[in-house]
């Protein structure tokens, strides 16, 4: 029994002695990976990464995930890695990553700076800057990553320029509203509003419909922006298009003989806030159609001699007697 106790003690001492050595070996492998990565030695990085045993990968899973992301950032310029980096950094920092850096005499701040510069480089070269920049910014906000104000401002500047370029090349309501929401006093607010105004005009020009005219005239953001300006570009052109649009609609209704609809649209034409007095170029043309529509509406009411007074009143107030 004494011998069994003695052996147990010996075994315990061996374990106490061996465990730190094993852990030191595992950490040493991680330190080498960081060194190869930091020194841009891609071949040694890849070979040692592939040889890493399962136990080391499991124990240092968070640190290894960060090293993999750094490899993808620095050597593969991966956009996905750029969005994954911030979360991976936070988890690895809570683990042993700072210790691994200290052992290799690599400044943690240098690792961060290099990663951030890589992300900026990848973002600037991206073909999808708008969604990509949003993903990067959201990733920073959702983690405790210690991003400084300089980097955050750089990201915002890149995103703002990307939104402007989007409005100039392929303007959409979504891009416009995003810019207004994120940069209400942005550097490019004038260009962005001008691009949206042009988009609204081109919609009307291509498809002169009631909905498109309403979108141009009733756009609150456009009204607010151009309120203090000398004039709104394309306003005269759109008024001219709307003037012709209403007149053509009246003409088509007249051919159908729908007096009620004609009367309504003529009233709309005369009183619409979208047109100035000078922009209503068809008033003379509509006078006859207007009185004709009134007469057609009057006809059903003239049923006997007593209702002839209605006709008399009509003749007193209307020019066209035929």
Predicted regions, residues:
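N-terminal, post-signal-peptide region of Sec/Tat-exported proteins
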Residues: 42-75, 101, 199
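Bacterial N-terminal signal peptides that target proteins for export
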Residues: 1-9
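Helix-turn-helix repeat elements of alpha-solenoid scaffolds
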Residues: 37-49, 75-95, 127-135, 169-174, ...
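Conserved small-residue packing positions in alpha-helical repeats and bundles
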Residues: 33-36, 65, 69-70, 118-124, ...
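Short solvent-exposed coil/turn linkers within tandem alpha-helical repeat scaffolds
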Residues: 51-61, 89-110, 137-155, 180-191, ...
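Fold-core signature of tandem repeat domains
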Residues: 155, 163, 167, 176-183, ...
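Bacterial N-terminal signal peptides
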Residues: 8-17
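Sec/Tat signal peptide C-region and signal peptidase I cleavage site
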Residues: 19-24
